[in-house]
Structures are given as C-alpha cells and as structure tokens.
Amino acid sequence: MSPASTAAEAGLIDVRTLAPEIAVDMRYAGPNNFTGRVVPGYLAPRCYLLRPAAEALARVAHALKTAGYRLQVFDCYRPVRAVHAFVAWAADLQDQSTKPQYYPRVDKQALLGDYIAETSGHSRGATVDLGLLDCRHGACHAVEMGTDFDFFDPRAHTDAPDISGVQRAHRQHLLRAMAIEGFANYPMEWWHFTFRPEPTPQTAYDVPVD
C-alpha cells in the first residue's frame, strides 16, 4: 500500500477540475448507500482519480456533452479503510436494514466474495462507478438502466437478460462511450469501469477523500 497521506501525494486529482460538467453523487460520502451510513474515509463528496484516468474520463464527459448527456459519478477512488468497512458490514448478518433496497433477492451471506471483495480496484485510483444523465430536453434526468447503483442482484449484470430493450440500449450507450477512452466494464455491474492500462496496478491508496 502506498505511504501517501494526502490525495496530492498519491497523485489523485478531482475530476471536476478537468470536467466540471460531470455530476457528482458520491454515495459513500452520505448515508444513501447499502451500509446506510457515511463510509469511513469519505470526508467530502469528491471524485478523485489518478491523472491518466481522470483525463480519460474528462474526454468521455466532453464527448457525451456534445450529444446532450452528462456523466453522473457514484464512486471513484475508494480508500482501503472504506473497503475494510464494507467487508465488516457484509460479515454482520444481523444488520439487514438495507436489504429491501439493495439486495432483496440475495442472502447477505452471499454478498462477500460475489459482490463485495476484500480488496478493490477502486483503491488503485483508476476505477469509477457511474451512470448517465439525459440533458437533451432541458432539465437533466437519470437515464433508466434497469437497476439503481449498488443493487446486488443478477439484474445489475451488464448483459442481464431480464431488463427492457431500452434499458439494455442505455447500458450499451454508456459502455461504448467509456470503451472509446480505454475504460473496461466489470460484467457483474453495469456502472463499474476501470481505465486500462491501470497507472499503478500494484498499488492501493488509503488517503481520505476530502
């Protein structure tokens, strides 16, 4: 793990300094997430990425803007301490308070491994979770993707068969836009993309998001 103690030392930058049109809805900086509370390590709702990934994401955002769309980010760089908090939450089988919203069809004991990992590519600073906003007709609104972010369910798989044709087309729109700039999708989560090649594939960071 990197000894860096600040985002600047780690080489992490706020993506909105490059693309202010990106909408930020950092779920783990508030209680609107599967743990039901602010996640350790998130002191502010900022999207940090290593510069190569941030610059690539800015290019995606600029291209989508010309077509009337905006990116909406839910998570970007994730401190290691946050990953540990997720693992601890998944191991606490007594806490089922968010099951109806986030994992109604999956047993919580199945989340660890399949959906929540003990290490995360997010901690390496080149992975982002996001969706699309449609701004073509005035006020922006979220593009329907078939599930919400962090919905632990097979329907969140990018190629899930039990979503509508319109929802599938929306997922493919996002997939194509991200792929052009080198982002690879994680097939179990339509929202999850990693910039390739990763700038620091062997290094995780634990600096706070502040």
Regions found by a protein language model. Give the residues of each.
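Conserved metal-phosphate-binding beta-hairpin within the catalytic cores
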Residues: 193
